[in-house]
């Protein structure tokens, strides 16, 4: 079930004489997909990562919260889905397009993340390949929306049909990627540890690793049980077998870089010679910049 809701936010700046000296209209379009009776995915062009909304008997659990300015539209949309209040926000990792909406949620909400993600959110360092830091909404909120509860390896929230299991298997997209499982619904939110079928973004500046990511993905696949559906970070849903294939894709990419180094190739030479294997024909590899950046990350790790 999909529907599109348009939520408009008009920002204006006026002088004392009521003349407008500047105004910006930002239209937030949220698309809602119902995966189960009580589980929804919220998407929105320009809004950042996919949001999961899990309606429990005690309240609503939200996984990730999109870019700056999207928190209130998310809250408004949730009100059309259920009268239950939001009690918990879980962040899969620290990137601004997954956590900035936190700032709009009440201070009664519990914010949960891996301990590394909390540290990354507090620092908000530039991502790998960029010089400017991301927008840090938490500076404006005096820390409101930062994680108030963290975990190291595994943690469970709720019980019975409302239970959520959180896992950490190691470095991947960042150094603190959380895997969020809804056992009763056989569904997992993987965040950007599984972007979708495309070349990954390895943010080494925030703990990501091109050397570790294949093992991390394989551990997730081999450890988590009874999951059929994966909510990806930015794409449509994936299957459990897709995760196994995603791990293989990243392992093959790593071995390709290792082989290139053994042959004495430079980063540019490895990048220009890489050809996507035919078994991954449906993977998006059109971003040559991402391919080169990931090769650079791996080469630096291997040195």
Predicted segments with their positions:
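Bacterial N-terminal signal peptides that target proteins for export
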Residues: 1-13, 17
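Extracytoplasmic/secreted envelope proteins and their assembly/folding machinery
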Residues: 51, 71-75, 102, 191, ...
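Short catalytic-loop micro-motif centered on adjacent basic/acidic residues
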Residues: 41, 61-64, 87-91, 165-166
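Divalent metal-coordination and catalytic microenvironments
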Residues: 38, 54, 64, 78, ...
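Conserved beta-strand hairpin/beta-sheet module of binuclear metal-dependent hydrolase folds
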Residues: 33-77, 178-182, 186-192
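Metallo-beta-lactamase
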Residues: 59-61, 67-69, 156, 163-252, ...
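Active-site HxH/HxHxD metal-binding segment of metal-dependent hydrolases
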Residues: 76-156, 175-177
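Accessory terminal helices/loops
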Residues: 14-24, 222-227, 236-303
């Amino acid at each position: 079930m999909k529907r599109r809701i348009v939520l408009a936010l008009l920002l204006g700046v006026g002088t004392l004489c009521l003349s407008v000296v500047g105004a910006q209209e930002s239209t937030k379009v949220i698309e809602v997909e119902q995966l189960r009776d009580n589980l929804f995915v919220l998407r929105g062009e320009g809004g950042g990562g996919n949001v999961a909304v899990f309606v429990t008997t005690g309240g609503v659990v939200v996984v990730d919260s999109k870019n700056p300015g999207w928190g209130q539209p998310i809250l408004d949309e949730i009100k059309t889905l259920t009268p239950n209040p939001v009690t918990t926000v879980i962040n899969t990792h620290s990137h601004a397009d997954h956590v900035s909406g936190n700032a709009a949620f009440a201070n009664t909400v519990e914010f949960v993340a891996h301990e590394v993600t909390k540290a990354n959110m507090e620092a908000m360092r530039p991502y790998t390949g960029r010089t400017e830091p991301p927008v840090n909404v938490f500076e404006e909120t005096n820390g409101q929306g930062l994680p108030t509860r963290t975990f190291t390896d595994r943690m469970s929230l709720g019980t019975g049909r409302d239970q959520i299991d959180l896992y950490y298997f190691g470095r991947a997209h960042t150094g603190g990627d959380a895997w969020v499982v809804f056992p009763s619904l056989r569904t997992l939110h993987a965040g950007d540890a599984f972007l979708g079928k495309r070349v990954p973004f390895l943010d080494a500046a925030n703990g990501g690793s091109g050397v570790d990511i294949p093992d991390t993905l394989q551990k997730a696949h081999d450890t988590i049980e009874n999951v059929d559906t994966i909510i990806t970070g930015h794409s449509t849903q994936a299957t459990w077998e897709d995760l196994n294939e995603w791990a293989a894709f990243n392992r093959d990419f790593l071995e390709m870089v290792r082989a290139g180094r053994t042959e004495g190739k430079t980063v540019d030479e490895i990048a220009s010679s890489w050809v996507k294997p035919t078994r991954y024909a449906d993977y998006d590899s059109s971003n040559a910049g991402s391919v080169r950046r990931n090769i650079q990350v791996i080469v630096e790790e291997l040195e």
